[in-house]
Design a protein with these regions (language model features):
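Short, Lys/Arg-enriched N-terminal segments with co-localized hydrophobic residues
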Residues: 1-18
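Gly/Lys-enriched N-terminal cap/neck module of very large, oligomeric protein machines
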Residues: 20-192
Length: 192
């Protein structure tokens, strides 16, 4: 919400979408063996569907691109390369996982002159090392963290909540809840 105040009196309250995820491209990530593109519009607030259709894997993919380093949090074995599609009865395993998030940046929420921001992470089975990209340019995870810090996004953000995290958020210590709210509000960088 955008709130405009004049001499302590609310003069206008309006809803404005400042940024949204336009699409996610997944290839070789968990159950998404083939390249899959999911388009979103700015009115999407959640992902729903029957059990086993990949909702949690989409959520994991978003968190992974934004820097999640815990294989346990991604529900994937013991090695980060375990997130790579490992084959099935009818499909061979693939050698790489790549996920790209494409954000609308027409309002310049991200500190960039581009109308779209692409954030990509990929991993190769051969060396188990991740590569990161912003708008197809190689970068470090720190660069991605710096880019999203002001937006309320991040691997631990309240922007991305799984079913299991709702109860853990409610049971969290007050200081842990506060830091999540600070990240969601985009003020975490000012505490450093």
């Amino acid at each position: 919400y955008i709130l405009r105040v004049f001499f302590g009196i609310i003069i206008q309250l309006e809803w404005r979408v400042l940024m949204f995820l336009k699409r996610i491209e997944l290839q070789g990530f968990k159950s998404f063996a083939d390249k899959t593109v999911i388009q979103f519009d700015q009115d999407i607030t959640g992902i729903v569907g029957p059990n086993g259709c990949g909702k949690s894997n989409v959520n994991d993919a978003i968190r992974w691109v934004l820097g999640e380093q815990s294989v346990k949090s991604l529900r994937s074995g013991t090695n980060m390369s375990d997130i790579i599609f490992s084959g099935s009865e009818y499909r061979k395993p693939v050698n790489m996982a790549r996920v790209t998030l494409v954000f609308d940046n027409s309002t310049r929420v991200f500190d960039s002159d581009f109308d779209e921001i692409e954030i990509t992470r990929q991993i190769l089975r051969a060396n188990n090392e991740a590569s990161y990209f912003i708008n197809k340019t190689p970068c470090r995870l720190k660069d991605i963290n710096d880019l999203v810090m002001d937006t309320g996004l991040g691997k631990d953000s309240l922007s991305i909540i799984t079913q299991g995290n709702i109860s853990s958020f409610a049971d969290a210590k007050p200081e842990d809840r506060r830091s999540l709210f600070e990240e969601a509000a985009g003020v975490a960088k000012y505490k450093k």
